[in-house]
Every structure is written in C-alpha cells, then in structure tokens.
From Swiss-Prot:
Domain of life: Bacteria
General function of this protein: Putative symbiotic effector that modulates nodulation in legumes. When delivered into the plant cell, modulates the activity of signal transduction pathways that culminate in activation of PR proteins.
This protein's encoding gene: nopL
Annotated spans, Disordered: 1-48, 85-158, 187-209, 230-259
Compositional bias per record (Basic and acidic residues), positions renumbered to this chain: 85-97
Protein name (database record): Nodulation outer protein L
Organism from which the protein derives: Sinorhizobium fredii (strain NBRC 101917 / NGR234)
Cellular component GO terms held in the UniProt record: extracellular region
Disulfide bonds: none
Biased composition (Polar residues): 1-14, 126-138, 242-258
Length: 338
C-alpha cells in the first residue's frame, strides 16, 4: 500500500469532500484539517465556563486548575480569615469593653450610688468624682488590719453587674484577718518579747532538778539494796587492788567477814604456774582443783558450817558455794537465781 496516496479515508475527515487535484491542493486540505476545531460530539474534554482563562488555549487541566483557586485571583491570599485577623489591629473602642459598659450605663454610676448609700461604719469612703480626681480614704472604724469592702461590693439591693467579682476581691469577706499567720504578723510585739525572754534556770536543766530530789538520791537507793540483801540488788563492781577506781561503796555487798573487804584473787598464782585471771571463766561453774587450792590457800574455802564465801576477780564479786564434800560451785554475783 502506498502511504503517500490520497484517498477519502485518510485525506479528509469528511467522506463527501472531493479529492484534491494536485499536491498543493492536498497540502492545503491537510492543513485545514489539522487546525480546524473539532466537532462537539468528537470532543473528549468537558466544556469549561466562559470566564476560564484557559478557554482560548483549551488546556487539558483547565477544569482542575479552576477548581483549585476558588477566588478570582490566586494571589488574593489576604482575604483569608486568619490573615485578616492578624493584620487588623483592634479598634480603641474594643480594647476596654468593661470601661465602655460602665460608662454606657448611667443607672449604675458609682457617684450616684455612693450619694444614695451614704457613709457606713468601717467602710471605704470615696469622694465625689465630678469635682476632680477621686479621693479615697478610710472611715474612722476602718484600719489597715480590718478593711471593709466598698458599699457597691456588698449592697445586694443595687444589683451591681460586677458585684460577685467585687465580693471575691474583698478580703474582709474571706476572713483573712482570722488567719494565724496574719495575726502573728500583725502583732509582732508578743513574738519579739517571747524571743527576747531568756529561759529560766529551771527550764534549762530538768534532769538536774530531778536528780536533786531527795527521794532519788543514789546513796538512799544503795542503802535500800543493802537492806534487801545480796540477792535483791544489781551487779556492781567493787574496789580493785589493781587500780584506784571504785564503782560502788563496799557496804553495798556482803563480805566474807564483817567489816572487811573481799579479797582480790586476780593475781593469785595457782599450782599450774599461771595467774587465776588468765584462765578464769566468767559464768557459773564448778570449781576445778586449782581453784579449790586457791580458795584453801586464801582461807575462802566454803564448808558445811560456812556455806558461802565472797571474793573478787578483777573487781567482780564471785560467790563460792558449798555443794558437798569436794564439790564447790563458783558463780558471779550477777547471777542471782542460778
């Protein structure tokens, strides 16, 4: 097939058009076909409105571009609500709504209200504002520590539009003067006097006063222990030959002989050649042969006639008890019932 040949099918969209006579007529007919507007039935794009900027060029996306800009011009962003709010400065009349409300309501004039109410005891007194600047002062019964609210704050008959807010702003209705901290701050004189007063000697040493009471005398306590016997008092350390310290008087404990101190046997050298304290057992125990030899040598061996004897071991009292022939029990004095 010759592609350069002309025919009614490929040369003209109209089948009834006559075939071209020569090449120039064919070119003229072809150019007219390329630039001729299509028919309404052959158009694949919907028709746009008459005011579309793309109507003449028939842009394929003109309908979407028109819907993306609802405003007449895409540069008119200043018509946005938020932008207009930010750019617009408030009018002076809109800056003080409360002042305009008070000035626009003559029936709630403060001067007329004060003249009608009159002075009250313990309330704020406000001078006339028409003659000059407002002068405020305290009534004779009002003090800085006991202020009273303005009359328009508590007068319920006038029905002031801001009475509820003024009531909260009034400190006297909140009873702040009853607060402990406020009262202490308002009257610092008692606190200063309390801090300036030095404590008495009786308040500084309560324990010393208790020890000075006669019934708490330590000597009387030890005398009662002596009267109760050796089993009633606590363990106390008596005088030691190895040092000058003495914990309790000698009369607090029974001795082997009347009026004599118990013998100190710490340095006694036993038959084994060691001192008694080096191998001593501080607990109730049965006496060994060396210990019984020590008691015989010192004359403190208990017998059936003298069942108990007392001696000191490093200042600690010990009692030797006779339990039978050749059986001696030694116990420290701290163990009363063993």
């Amino acid at each position: 097939m010759d592609i350069n040949s002309t025919s009614p099918l490929n040369a003209s969209p109209q089948p009834d058009s006559p075939p071209p006579a020569n090449a120039s007529a064919f070119a003229h007919q072809l150019s007219g076909f390329q630039y001729s507007p299509p028919h309404a039935a052959d158009s694949l794009l919907p028709q746009v409105e008459a005011d579309s900027p793309y109507l003449d060029t028939r842009h394929p996306y003109s309908q979407y571009l028109d819907s993306a800009y609802p405003y007449p011009s895409p540069c008119e962003w200043q018509h946005d609500l938020y932008t207009r709010t930010r750019e617009r400065s408030p009018h002076p009349s809109e800056q003080r709504p409360h002042a305009r409300v008070l000035q626009g309501a003559p029936e709630h004039d403060q001067d007329q209200h004060l003249e009608a109410a009159g002075p009250r005891e313990g309330s704020w007194q406000v001078g006339p504002s028409r003659s000059g600047p407002s002068q405020a002062g305290l009534s004779p019964s009002a003090t800085p520590l006991n202020p009273s609210p303005p009359p328009h704050a508590t007068d319920l008959e006038t029905k002031h539009p801001y009475s509820q807010y003024l009531d909260w702003a009034n400190p006297s209705l909140l009873d702040w003067q009853q607060d402990l901290h406020t009262r202490a701050t308002a009257s610092p004189a008692p606190l200063t006097a309390e801090r300036g007063r030095s404590p008495q000697p009786s308040e500084q040493q309560p324990h010393a006063r208790a020890l000075q009471v006669p019934e708490y005398d330590q000597d009387l306590i030890w005398q009662r222990v002596d009267a109760a016997g050796p089993q009633a008092g606590p363990w106390q350390v008596g005088p030691s030959h190895s040092g000058p310290s003495q914990a309790r008087p000698s009369h607090a404990w029974p001795s082997s002989s009347a009026g004599a101190e118990p013998a100190e046997l710490s340095d006694f050298v036993m038959d084994s050649g060691v001192r008694a304290w080096d191998h001593w057992f501080l607990a109730p125990h049965m006496a060994s042969e060396d210990q019984m030899s020590m008691l015989r040598a010192t004359g403190l061996m208990p017998t059936a006639e003298v069942p108990t004897t007392t001696f000191l071991m490093m200042g600690m009292r010990h009692v030797a008890e006779f339990r039978g022939e050749g059986v001696i029990r030694i116990r420290p004095s701290v163990d009363f019932d063993i």
